[in-house]
Amino acid sequence: PKEEHKTRDIWTAEVLQKALEACDDDILRLAINLAFSCSLRMGELLGLTWDCIDISPTSIELGQASIFVEKELQRVNREAMADLDGKDIMFKFPPTFASTHTALVLKTPKTKTSVRKVFLPKTVAEMLVQRKADIEELKDLFGDEFVDFNLVFCSSNGKPIEGQVINRA
């Protein structure tokens, strides 16, 4: 039988504004702004890498700052991944625990139309510039302990952030 999906409530502009006003975490604020201004799904947001972002001063000045959405972060069953023979998997993150039955990966989106270029509002582009600077500071602070996967949304040691972390915040 077909699985019934719950319909999700769509935030109004007022609810979004209240959420942003109540948000005191810069990373979460950036995630909310990117999700709404660029219509990003959670996996696309968390799979965003710096090589897919154009936030050069010239691009921002000309209103051409953009992101290229070509991958998503997803936790997949190791057996299913073996069956796929690596198809659609762009990168497999090292496991945190040896005994897990799943793996965290960057994979291509489900549909070709999900691959897209999205232009950024200037305010969001400037937030990304600040995030990049913050990550550079973390790299200096943590040195060799910082694992650089080139992710926009990463923990303080560079490792990926999963969706449930954002959902809990």
Locations of the language-model features?
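Flexible loop/turn segments at secondary-structure boundaries
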Residues: 41, 76-77, 161
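Short, basic (Lys/Arg/His-rich) helix/loop patches that form interaction surfaces
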Residues: 17-28, 38, 118, 133-144, ...
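Residue-level detector of conserved, well-ordered beta-strand and adjacent loop positions
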Residues: 8, 12, 20, 70, ...
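Short, flexible loop/turn elements at secondary-structure junctions
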Residues: 36-38, 73, 124, 157
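Phosphate- and divalent-cation-binding pockets in alpha/beta enzyme and binding domains
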Residues: 44, 127, 169
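Conserved tyrosine-mediated DNA breakage-rejoining catalytic core shared by Y-recombinases
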Residues: 15, 48-137, 141-149
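Basic, Lys/Arg- and aromatic-enriched nucleic-acid-binding interface segment
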Residues: 1-50, 61-64, 113-115, 144-148
